Amino acid sequence: MPPKAAEKKPTTGGKAPAGKAPAEKKEAGKKTAAAASGDKKKRGKTRKETYSSYIYKVLKQVHPDTGISTRAMSILNSFVNDIFERVATEASKLAAYNKKSTISSREIQTSVRLILPGELAKHAVSEGTKAVTKYSSSAK
């Protein structure tokens, strides 16, 4: 269907007229200067929470003389987020199956056993149990 007469655009070859471009830049500059002077509330920088510092601390405990690249840190951070997401989803399903509204350490432990394979699950469960015991004894 051909465009209506009111919808036709001027044929300038896709470019704006030369006289308008500098004026638009000046106006944009004025807007940013006005925002910087305090007319509007300044928006704070959004914080991105990562596990980078914790991964780095563990790396230094295991291999004190080894470094890690930014890309490798990003991959490990994605890995940790993925595992936590899987465990949380599985624990949520387990709580729903048992008609409970609270995820406890028992659901977390069961979901870890279901998600992680064999020996890895055993080590994860023992480390988790150790961490919960340590926390419980220090909280008193």
From Swiss-Prot:
There is a cross-link at K8, K9, K25, K26 (Glycyl lysine isopeptide (Lys-Gly) (interchain with G-Cter in SUMO)). PROSITE patterns: HISTONE_H2B (PS00357). GO terms for molecular function: DNA binding; protein heterodimerization activity; structural constituent of chromatin. It is found in: Nucleus; Chromosome. It comes from the Eukaryota. InterPro entries: Histone-fold (IPR009072), Histone_H2A/H2B/H3 (IPR007125), Histone_H2B (IPR000558), HISTONE_H2B_site (IPR055333). There is a cross-link at K134 (Glycyl lysine isopeptide (Lys-Gly) (interchain with G-Cter in ubiquitin)). SUPFAM superfamilies: Histone-fold. Transmembrane segments: none annotated. The keyword Ubl conjugation applies. One of its GO terms (cellular component) is nucleus. The modification N6-acetyllysine is found at K8, K9, K15, K25. Residues 11-21 have a biased composition (Low complexity). Keywords: Acetylation, Chromosome, DNA-binding, Isopeptide bond, Nucleosome core, Nucleus, Ubl conjugation. The nucleosome is a histone octamer containing two molecules each of H2A, H2B, H3 and H4 assembled in one H3-H4 heterotetramer and two H2A-H2B heterodimers. The octamer wraps approximately 147 bp of DNA. Belongs to the histone H2B family. PANTHER family: HISTONE H2B. This is Histone H2B. It comes from Aspergillus terreus (strain NIH 2624 / FGSC A1156). The gene is htb1.
